[in-house]
């Protein structure tokens, strides 16, 4: 019950900043329009709407990292967390309390992307539902990564690292903008060692109904999600002991 009340408080805090929320939900749609326009004039298989949309949904989750990191960093700087550390809330309660309101926003963003892509020529099938469900592990990873960053960094640092660096890394390492095989070498090895490209390939496979291929990419995402969530809980636990 305490965790649910904390989650409700976090929801209200997120809704107090509708501009950032609108930007996070709307920017992936702008990219869909822009890249679809490029595809219409200079056909590139990577930018075909059925291939592009699943990748854009994965890229859009980078904004969930920024949301969660900013929320935690603001709470730390306002000393709210220091007061909450004196309550019976555990470190796990804090992490789940922050995650619960952001996860529906992430799934809403994904659904909006797919619905927005339909008039652009996206193939409509039940696989869209599978793709939305299948992105949950990656959404949890992104949110947990934001919570970890927010527990270690200040608001200004979060804006630079999560808002610029991680957003660009997510784009480059997911293979949304270019085929990783064209670069190859160390860059491709690094990309394959991280969850971003696996999430993009998972989404493409689920959307295409290729569940065997999707199964090949789910494990790295689950492992990264569990590891980052555990790291975030550990950071909160350490801060609670300090205060």
Model-inferred region functions:
Residues 91, 95-168, 210, 214-222, ...:
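Alpha-helical transmembrane segments and their short interhelical loops
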Residues 85, 89, 120, 153-154, ...:
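Short helix-loop-helix connector
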Residues 3-15, 203:
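A short amphipathic helical element positioned immediately N-terminal to and/or at the very start
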Residues 13-41, 49-69, 106-109, 168-171, ...:
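Hydrophobic alpha-helical transmembrane segments of multi-pass membrane transport/permease proteins
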Residues 30, 34, 49-119, 165:
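Hydrophobic alpha-helical transmembrane segments of multi-pass membrane transport proteins
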Residues 32, 36-37, 114, 118, ...:
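Transmembrane alpha-helix boundary and packing residues in multipass membrane permease domains
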Residues 42-46, 123, 174-228:
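Membrane-interfacial helix-loop-helix junctions in multi-pass membrane proteins
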Residues 236-243:
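Short cytosolic juxtamembrane segments of multi-pass membrane proteins
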